[in-house]
Amino acid sequence: MPSINAQLHHVNVTVPKSAEDAAKHFYATVLGLREVSKPEESRGRGGAWYQLGGMQLHLSIEDGLSEKCLSKRHICYTVNDLSVAEEQFRRAGVEIIPDDLPTRGWARFYVRDPGGNRLEIAQAV
């Protein structure tokens, strides 16, 4: 079967309207992602788009979501210094969720954004 040469362009996470401002602060300020302009036809829908290296994270508003949609599904962000990242999250008042299943070659912890989305923060060791 021939390859379709698929590449990851963006990941979309959703939060309830009530968490939109806190989520924007979380991704732009706490995580340090660079916000990019959305296409005009998407601007009236709320949320924000962020550039992350060669891909994007799209933050969308979804009606009917509970305040915390707890699940183990997650997006993994790699960092150069896990202890610096952990301290930055703690200073921002973000709860650190310890790694409950250590994986050889990686040090990591988890956090949740204001909409309840789970993020893995990892460093190769």
Could you describe each region identified by the protein language model?
Residues 1-6, 91-125:
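Vicinal oxygen chelate
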Residues 1-24, 73-75:
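N-terminal beta-strand motif that seeds the catalytic metal site of vicinal oxygen chelate
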Residues 13-56:
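Core segments of cupin and vicinal oxygen chelate
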Residues 19, 80-82:
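Helix N-cap motif at beta-to-alpha junctions
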Residues 23, 85-88:
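Hydrophobic side chains in well-ordered alpha-helices
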Residues 29, 88-92:
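Short amphipathic alpha-helices in soluble, non-transmembrane regions
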Residues 44, 71, 105:
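Exposed loop/turn and edge beta-strand positions of beta-sandwich/beta-sheet ligand-binding modules
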Residues 54-58, 116-119:
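Short, charged/polar, Gly/Pro-enriched secondary-structure boundary elements
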